[in-house]
Design a protein with these regions (language model features):
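Acidic anion/phosphate-binding donor-loop and adjacent secondary structure
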Residues: 70, 74, 158-161, 173-192, ...
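A conserved mid-protein helix/loop that constitutes part of the nucleotide-sugar donor-binding site
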Residues: 23-31, 199-222, 239-245
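N-terminal strand-loop element at the rim of the active site
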Residues: 2, 10, 15-78, 239-240, ...
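Aromatic "clamp/platform" in nucleotide-sugar-dependent glycosyltransferases that forms part
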Residues: 262, 281
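A charged, aromatic-enriched C-terminal amphipathic alpha-helix characteristic of glycosyltransferases
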Residues: 24, 339-368
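Nucleotide-activated donor-binding/catalytic signature segment of Leloir-type glycosyltransferases, i.e.
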Residues: 245-261
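A short, active-site helix/loop in glycosyltransferases that binds the activated sugar's phosphate group
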Residues: 136, 144-181
């Protein structure tokens, strides 16, 4: 579906997201654009992000709002003008706080938006506790105010709307073809990253207390006692990165832990990995676990994650507390790369539900 800038046939869509960084929502939007869906996008903050240029290459016009914490009123005036001047008839909100999304709905309606789509991607607001309370207070109001309610999973629906009734569960789209791992691709990836003959562990995501890279590092410390040639890769950036780097140094693990920063194309790292860690305090329906399964990689994740994300049998759920570090260690050490046939089977299983072209087509039908 191509947007009609004159507003005649196909309505114009504006997608709102937190940033244009490397998060799951942003990757979802990019995957949909690359699959042929057409929309423009607006970030909640003025900062430019790592995926913004890639989105623009797909024909997506990008906008930025004044940071809400700096000027609350200007934040909403910016949004009003973007919607009004751009003549966007559909506004697609992607966030995790019912109160702030409701305020965006009021602004969008005032600016002329005809249809509001609210899309839940998480199971709580990772910010201050008072924001969580506000979100709970406004869940029913948000639910009643939206024209279409979407969620990446049942738990995400319950968090944002307080119900999963009349909420469309829309899986996160990924590029499954790009994530297919043959023996040749795995060998080339390990050679390129200088990882031949080593057991490779990977965690993908922003450095934030919610993601618990510190827990992964404590697990890896135990792994390293058994396998000195093991390697841990933290792909991502964020406020906690220096803290984790210092922690690795204090543990004497710095030579075995890599920090490549934000990686636009993770397929090389998934192809090289033996296991992916995700010990998060909470997530919605994490794209990382879908991508890892599509690449045929064993996954270790928190019990708090929606268990329905295990579509291939490759995901193991464990409690992520101090008493369970040994259990994580044993499970990680048992992780071995799958055969090429099994990786292909896993990829095809994920592609049945989560291929970007399929999700893009479904969303277009829902929006119109």
């Amino acid at each position: 579906m191509k947007q009609d800038t004159n507003g005649s046939d196909n309505p114009k869509i504006l997608a709102l997201c937190g940033t244009f960084g490397m998060g799951g929502i942003e990757k979802m939007l990019l995957n949909l654009l690359q699959a042929g869906m057409s929309f423009d996008a607006c970030a909640d903050i003025p900062d430019h992000g790592d995926l913004e240029e890639e989105m623009q290459k797909c024909g997506c016009q990008t906008f930025h709002l004044t940071r809400r914490s700096q000027n609350f009123i200007k934040h909403h005036i910016d949004l009003y003008r973007i919607i009004r001047d751009g003549k966007y008839s559909i506004v697609w909100l992607n966030s995790q706080n019912a109160f702030f999304m409701w305020l965006h709905i009021l602004t969008a309606r005032a600016a002329g938006a005809k249809k509001i789509v609210v899309h839940s991607h998480n199971t709580r607001d990772w910010r201050a506790k008072d924001k969580n309370r506000l979100s709970r207070m406004f869940r029913h109001i948000l639910y009643q105010s939206a024209d279409i309610c979407l969620a990446c999973g049942k738990e995400a629906a319950l968090w944002l709307f307080g119900t999963d009734q009349n909420v469309q569960i829309v899986p996160l789209p990924i590029d499954t073809n790009h994530l297919m791992v043959t023996d040749k691709k795995r060998s080339c990836a390990r050679q390129t990253l200088c990882l031949e003959g080593r057991q490779v562990f990977l965690q993908v995501g922003r450095f934030d207390p919610v993601k618990r890279q510190d827990y992964t590092l404590r697990v890896f410390e135990k792994i390293h006692e058994v396998k000195q040639n093991a390697v841990l890769i933290f792909a991502g950036d964020g406020q906690e990165k220096q803290k984790i780097l210092d922690m690795a140094k204090q543990m004497g693990l710095l030579s075995s832990v890599r920090f490549p920063g934000n990686v636009k194309d993770m397929s090389l790292y998934y192809a090289a990995a033996d296991a992916v860690f995700l010990p998060s305090l909470y997530e919605g329906f994490p794209t990382v676990l879908l991508e890892a399964q599509a690449a045929g990689v064993f996954c270790l994740t928190s019990e708090t994650i929606d268990h329905t994300i295990n579509r291939t049998g490759l995901v193991r759920f464990l409690k992520a507390n101090e008493k369970q570090i040994d259990a994580w260690t044993v499970a990680a050490l048992s992780a071995k790369g799958l055969s090429e046939d099994d990786r292909i089977k896993a990829n095809r299983r994920i592609a049945q539900e989560y291929n970007a072209e399929t999700i893009a087509f479904r969303l277009e039908k829902l929006f119109l």
